[in-house]
Amino acid sequence: MNTDEPKDAYEYLDMLRRQNKKEFQSFSAFSEYLESKARKQGVPIHGQFELTPLCNLSCKMCYVHLSADQLQGRSLLPAESWKDLMHQAFEAGMFQATLTGGECLTYPEFDTLYLYLHSLGCQVDVLTNGILLNEERIRFFKAHPPGLIQITLYGWSDDVYERVTGRRAFHTVHENILRVKEAGLPLLLTVTPNMFLGEDVFETIRLARSLSDDILINTSLFVPEEEPWRMNAADDPEAAFYARILRFDQELRGITPQERPIDELPLPGGPCSTCPEPGLECGGGRSGFVITWKGEMRICNRMAPRSYPLRDGFAEAWKTIHHTAVNWPRPAACSGCAYEAVCNKCAAEFLKYAVPGEKPEALCARTRYMASRGILSLPGCES
């Protein structure tokens, strides 16, 4: 038994302050405490609702986007079905919900669902491409504040936007980002490197850093589920390109990466030959879930296991994916590995390189390479 574990949220906040010697925003830190407890107890406190696969952009690398013709006669879930699922999720413990798509703001009854979640007392985050964040939408969000507006930036000019998304939408998005900032709404900008964006990713990141203190750079692409042929491996940059991107961002933030010869770094892999305790190391299926536009529950957007809350009810569907998540096999070689603290432990990322429970050799090599380039700081190997 770990006697150092805080017994309540107040002790948790005190622990964070002692460790970091600074004050914390109470809700953010309290959310972290709830997250740690929820994972242990299997409570679904986070829910992501993929309202629609339809979008007003046509990004070549998007994992979910479909056109109206590609729906092939299938229809979007009506608002009442979504509300029923959301209420069941709330009853099961959800207090934070993310609305996404496609482009979630194109869903005809977006406002109805957003306000319904607010009425339940949920924090609501919105993932959007930013095109529809006009003055009217900003007034709506000021009246009913979201927990976060996350906007993906696909370029730094109309020419780049057209190449990546099929639409010259940069100036619209840029103006709308400024609207969000002026309104004082919480903002996160994301950038997704890909070979359609190419070298323009650097100016895109520079622009993102000038617009927001909070940006996220994705480091892999999702394979489209409906049309896996639409993206091939060449669309996802190689490790060397990601290293250039992440070093560039470090330098923008005043961080000087410390490179080391790769042969001075330890080989990946720990001493264990028996499998460690199973279970996903993220919150997917343990404290969070995704419900797709088809009404299927998933561990996350990138993993295949699914259940059917429309047929079986939310509680039974959650039980199914939670069982999968807590019994997910982990590679024995990861336990005690020198890179254990810095490795990307995303199970979906592991699945790109190996079957569940096996060591993902190519990912291990990539992690070692990133450490040699100074992107990852390996404990015990700092200069």
Model-derived regions: residue spans:
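Membrane-interface junctions of multi-pass transporters
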Residues: M303-K345
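Canonical radical SAM enzyme core domain
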Residues: D69-D84, C104-P146, T152-D159, R163, ...
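Short, well-ordered coil/turn segments that N-cap beta-strands
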Residues: G93-Q96, L120-V124, P145-G147, A183-P186, ...
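N-terminal pre-core extensions flanking Radical SAM catalytic domains
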Residues: M1-Q70, H87-F90, P268, P379-E382
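Short Fe-S-cluster ligation motifs
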Residues: L85-G101, E361-S383
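Radical SAM enzyme [4Fe-4S]-AdoMet core and its adjacent flexible, acidic
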Residues: N2-Y10, G147, T152-R298, R302-Y308
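Local cysteine-cluster metal-coordination motifs and their immediate loop/turn environment
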Residues: L54-H65, A332-E349
